Structures are given as structure tokens and as C-alpha cells.
């Protein structure tokens, strides 16, 4: 019987957890020396690498001194809250990874809180001690305070701390004495993290995660809670409504390195993947068909935000996408529901419109961005928060937001947040920076990030996470400027843009194709105006001498997907295609728009 340790890794964005796992895989001699591997083997989807965030949790395992260590990488961002809880269910302990300079960050707190409630035993790793002016001792104190505030037990507070640098590939129990390998970390894992309890009896396994392969369909992943599962055995699947469906396990796989290994049986305490089970949901229990005993289901965080998805019906429809019809989009959203748990989709019976519910703008924009790269064309409406009735009161989601800025900008930021119905909860100074915590309605966060960065000259570090539902806070002012709208379709000319510069700022480059009703810029005043950007210089006027030789154009504002979603108004869509992103009015024709506004 192999000895097993199941650990989850908890860390803030960019504190180096994926790099650390790479090094642990190296230490477990997973790769032959001649096999060159890329950096960041875990974040294997392009989007994750670009943003440096882990979206989906993944499992890998390493063998060390006859122990099998299952490592579960958790997403750090609370927009993927549904992922976090399930993942922690498979672990017996956790590695809390903290940056030696920044200390524990708010998003770490979110995952850590869940881990402590589940009673996992932590091992703290203070990473990046090779950086200049880091402060490992202070950070260790901060971690202790944080755990204390999260109501950790005495046993949890008595945690071991390992210092090191994942990038340079060393870990040590004392940060002033660097070593040349990460063995001390592996030893600490084996010494401090409890082994899984082995329970004899009828088999039980809670399905906590799933994988999808076009070859065998959906694959259930979970940790065997009790007994053992064998290939080809009959099992009962306990559903949400209490019914039990008899099924048979076709194949069993355990995790071995980055891949999987087919095995005949899996004993309790190990993590495995089952092939051949149909129609299961996350939270169902695999158990004995004759006297089923379901395990307690996991609650997955409710969505707090919704957006409208619809087919692209702009004049440039189908120019650069492969999948453009409503059937394609419907199928793609169905497929996403298989993997993405915190997502809900509701179809409008009359039109090709879907309302997609998710955990926040980040969660939904990751989905849109993924679809865009796969060659889909679609349009998305303004993000709306989900309002609930609680005890007859209208309630809205409120988030805990932390902003870290240099001292001189703090008053500006406080002013900006309180205008959006946020309230300052705490404030403390570290050197010349100030860390502030606010409670702010989710509505107020939409579109806030760009403003905060502008006001603080790009210095602010901002992160937020869902807190709870609170009574409705009243109206919030959104962007007050109107839009500049293209009058007719065609190519935008520098000559026309130059003449219109004093009207506002533009979002388009000269020589770009535009269509009537497209939002091409932001008006300096608060009303929408229709401008003609397709006007070129008349031929007869070419030789007239004058000061109009050069058009001097201020460079246009370029939006990322999230910024565009946060920027648009309720009567606008973002049109997303594989090569372009445009903003447009929902009603393209000017006369019809005026009629609708009356």
C-alpha cells in the first residue's frame, strides 16, 4: 500500500504557485533529463498563461521516497469560487504560498478561509526571498494574524514555515541559509500533512470535478472516501433528488505526473478518474447500488452577475468568424456548462438571445475571450448584477475590495469609491503606501478599475471578492459622457477624424472599416452625437494652399475586453469576433434610435 498525501496549493495571483509546482515535478524526476519542458506546465491554456492566472484546477502527482503526493492547484481568484470549494474537498492539507515582499493578499484570504473552515492543516511557504527588500519575518507574522482572524484552531495556528525561491529552485527552513534543492519542502509536506484516513467498508466517492474528452465523453474525478473501487464493478450514482442510478465503471485512472495511468483498483484516500459513468453532476456520490449512502453535497457559490449573449447581427457579420449562427453559440454554451460550474444559461424563447449568469466580469470575460479565440462571433450586452428579494427587501451583491496605493492618491480613491456607494472599512499604512478596504456594491465595481488606475497614475493594486447580499444602496452614477456614433458605413479617414478631434476622443484608427451605428468614440459632453468619419478631402480642394497639409491625430483609446464590457451603456453591445472588438448601439439606425428613446 503506497503512502499518500493530498495537498492543495493556495496562493495569490502571481506569487508563483505554478512555478513552484513545476519545480516539485522536477524534483519528483518526472521528466527524463533530455525531455525539455516549457515553463508553467500547469497553466496549459493560452489565456491562463497570458494573464498569469489559473482558471481551472488541475491535478498532478509526484513520487518521493515511496510517498505519492497528489498536488491540486486551486484557482486563486474568487470569481472562480465554484472551483475552489470542490478542489479543497479532495485535500487533507494545504500549502499556503505567500510572496515575501507583498504578504498575504485578499484573494488568498478567500481560499484560505474555506480551507480553514474545512479543517485542513496548513504548511506556509514564503516564496521569492531572493528579491531585494523582502521581509520574510514580518510576512510570517502577517500570515499568523490572518489565520487568527479567520478563526483557525490552535493546531492550525501551529504551522511550519518554509522559506525559499521557487524561481531559483530552492527551499529551506531558514531564509538566510539557501540550499540548492526543494527537498526541505517535500519533507515538510510528508512530516506535517496528515495522511488520508483509510476507511474500510462499502465504497463511497464524492464527484468533485470533471474532465471532458471527445473520445470517451465526461470523466468523473474525485477522491475515494471509503472502501475501494475496481474496474468493471457495479455502482450506484446518488443524484441531487435522492434517486440512485445503477451504472458500471468502464475504466479507472489515477494521476501520475502530468498524465494518467490506468489501474485495476483504487483504495480509499487516493484521487482517481472514472470513465464510463453517464449523466452525473458535480456533487453526486458513487456508492454501493444495493444500500446507497450519499455523502454530503457541496454548495457551489451562486452567480452574482449576468450578461446578454446574442448572435452577431452587425453589417460585418461573418467576415472573420468560423462559427456565427445561433446553433453554434447554443452548442458552445451547452458544452461550457459541462465544465464551468458557477455558470448558468437561460435562453430567451422568442429570439436568439441567451442570458448568461456568472460570478463576475472576469469570470464571464474569460468565457467570451475563449470563445473568440476558437473562432466564434457574438455580441454581449452590459453586465447586470443579480438582485434578490430577501425578507421583502431588495438586496444586491456587495464585495470586499482592497486597494493599495501610494499615500498621495488615497484621498482621490476614497472619494471615487464613496461616490459609488462604497464605504471605507479599514486603512493602514505600510512604508509609503496605504492599504484600504472597502465594502462596495458589485454595481459600483463595474468600470471602476480604469478610473482608479487613471487617478493613481497606474500605481494602484486593486482586487475584490464577493462578500454577501445587502439591502439596495441606491443609485450609482455610471459614465456620464455620451458616445460618438458613425453616421454611415465605409472607411474612416484621417481627414475627417482630424476635423472632429475637439468633439471627444476616438476609439478607431484611420483607414479602419466602420458601419453606421458603431460607437467610434466618446463625446466630451453628455449626449450622443452622430459624426461622419468617412468623409475624405474633395479632389478639387487638393491643390489649394493652406494650413491643412497634415492631419495631426491623437492616438485612439484601445480597450481590452473587460474594459469594453465595463464601459458600454445599457443601449450598447460589444461585438466580439476573432480579429476585432467593436462597440455599437443596439439599434443601428439613427431615426429608429430617436423613435425608441422618446
Sequence positions of predicted segments:
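Conserved catalytic-core segments of large NTP-driven translation/proteostasis enzymes
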Residues: 148-282, 401-404, 465, 470-472, ...
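Active-site phosphate-binding and catalytic loops of NTP-dependent enzymes
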Residues: 30-57, 80, 146-159, 190-203, ...
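Long insertion/accessory domains within large nucleic-acid-processing enzymes
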Residues: 255, 260-263, 440, 453-454, ...
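Catalytic P-loop NTP-binding/switch module of NTPases
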Residues: 225-351, 373, 555
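Charged, conformationally dynamic linker/hinge segments
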Residues: 292, 300-432, 443-445
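Conserved C-terminal guanine-recognition region of P-loop GTPase G domains, centered on the G4
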Residues: 94-156
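Conserved nucleotide-binding/hydrolysis micro-motifs of P-loop NTPases
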Residues: 15, 27, 31, 77-78, ...
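P-loop NTPase switch module centered on the Walker A-proximal segment
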Residues: 1-98, 102, 142, 210-213
Amino acid at each position: 500500500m503506497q503512502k499518500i498525501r493530498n495537498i492543495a496549493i493556495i496562493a495569490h495571483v502571481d506569487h508563483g504557485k505554478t512555478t513552484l509546482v513545476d519545480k516539485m515535478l522536477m524534483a519528483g524526476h518526472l521528466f527524463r533529463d533530455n525531455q525539455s519542458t516549457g515553463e508553467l506546465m500547469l497553466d496549459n491554456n493560452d489565456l491562463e498563461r497570458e494573464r498569469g492566472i489559473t482558471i481551472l484546477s488541475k491535478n498532478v502527482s509526484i513520487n518521493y521516497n515511496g510517498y505519492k503526493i497528489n498536488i491540486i492547484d486551486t484557482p486563486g481568484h474568487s470569481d472562480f469560487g465554484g472551483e475552489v470549494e470542490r478542489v479543497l474537498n479532495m485535500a487533507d492539507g494545504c500549502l499556503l504560498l505567500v510572496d515575501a515582499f507583498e504578504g498575504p493578499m485578499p484573494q488568498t484570504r478567500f481560499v484560505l478561509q474555506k480551507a480553514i473552515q474545512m479543517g485542513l492543516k496548513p504548511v506556509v511557504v514564503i516564496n521569492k526571498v531572493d528579491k531585494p527588500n523582502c521581509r520574510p519575518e514580518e510576512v510570517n507574522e502577517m500570515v499568523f494574524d490572518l489565520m487568527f482572524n479567520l478563526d483557525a484552531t490552535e493546531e492550525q495556528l501551529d504551522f511550519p514555515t518554509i522559506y525559499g525561491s521557487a524561481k531559483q529552485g530552492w527551499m529551506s527552513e531558514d531564509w538566510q541559509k539557501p540550499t540548492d534543492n526543494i527537498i526541505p519542502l517535500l519533507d515538510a509536506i510528508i512530516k506535517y500533512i496528515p495522511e488520508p484516513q483509510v476507511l474500510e467498508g462499502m465504497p463511497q466517492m464524492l464527484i468533485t470535478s470533471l474532465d471532458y474528452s471527445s473520445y470517451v465523453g465526461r470523466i468523473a474525478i474525485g477522491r475515494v472516501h471509503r472502501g475501494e473501487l475496481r474496474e468493471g464493478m457495479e455502482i450506484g450514482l446518488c443524484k441531487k433528488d435522492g434517486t440512485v442510478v445503477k451504472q458500471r465503471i468502464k475504466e479507472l485512472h489515477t494521476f501520475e505526473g502530468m498524465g494518467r495511468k490506468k489501474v485495476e483498483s483504487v483504495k480509499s484516500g487516493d484521487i482517481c478518474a472514472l470513465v464510463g459513468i453517464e449523466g452525473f453532476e458535480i456533487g453526486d456520490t458513487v456508492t454501493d447500488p444495493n444500500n446507497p449512502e450519499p455523502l454530503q453535497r457541496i454548495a457551489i457559490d451562486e452567480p452574482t452577475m449576468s450578461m446578454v449573449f446574442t448572435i452577431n447581427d452587425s453589417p460585418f457579420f461573418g467576415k472573420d468568424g468560423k462559427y456565427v449562427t445561433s446553433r453554434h453559440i447554443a452548442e458552445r454554451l451547452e458544452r461550457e456548462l459541462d465544465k464551468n460550474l458557477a455558470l448558468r444559461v437561460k435562453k430567451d424563447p422568442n429570439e436568439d438571445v441567451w442570458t448568461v449568469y456568472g460570478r463576475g466580469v472576469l469570470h464571464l470575460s474569460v468565457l467570451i475571450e475563449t470563445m473568440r479565440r476558437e473562432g466564434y462571433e457574438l455580441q454581449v450586452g452590459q453586465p447586470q448584477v443579480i438582485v434578490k428579494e430577501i425578507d421583502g427587501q431588495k438586496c444586491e451583491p456587495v464585495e470586499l475590495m482592497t486597494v493599495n496605493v501610494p499615500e498621495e492618491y488615497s484621498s482621490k480613491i476614497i472619494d471615487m469609491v464613496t461616490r459609488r456607494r462604497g464605504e471605507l472599512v479599514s486603512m493602514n499604512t505600510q512604508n509609503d503606501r496605504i492599504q484600504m478596504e472597502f465594502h462596495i456594491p458589485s454595481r459600483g465595481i463595474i468600470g471602476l478599475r480604469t478610473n482608479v488606475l487613471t487617478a493613481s497614475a497606474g500605481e494602484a493594486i486593486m482586487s475584490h471578492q464577493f462578500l454577501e447580499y445587502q439591502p439596495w444602496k441606491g443609485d450609482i452614477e455610471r459614465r456620464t459622457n455620451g458616445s460618438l456614433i458613425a453616421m454611415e458605413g465605409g472607411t474612416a479617414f484621417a481627414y475627417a477624424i482630424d476635423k472632429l478631434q475637439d468633439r471627444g476622443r476616438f476609439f478607431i484608427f484611420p483607414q479602419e472599416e466602420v458601419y453606421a451605428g458603431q460607437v467610434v468614440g466618446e463625446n466630451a459632453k453628455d449626449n450622443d452625437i452622430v459624426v461622419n468619419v468617412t468623409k475624405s478631402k474633395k479632389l478639387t480642394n487638393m491643390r489649394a494652399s493652406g494650413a491643412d497639409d497634415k492631419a495631426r491625430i491623437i492616438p485612439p483609446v484601445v480597450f481590452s475586453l473587460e474594459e469594453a464590457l465595463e464601459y458600454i451603456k445599457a443601449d450598447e453591445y460589444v461585438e466580439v469576433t476573432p480579429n476585432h472588438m467593436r462597440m455599437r448601439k443596439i439599434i443601428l439606425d439613427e431615426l429608429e434610435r430617436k423613435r425608441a428613446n422618446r
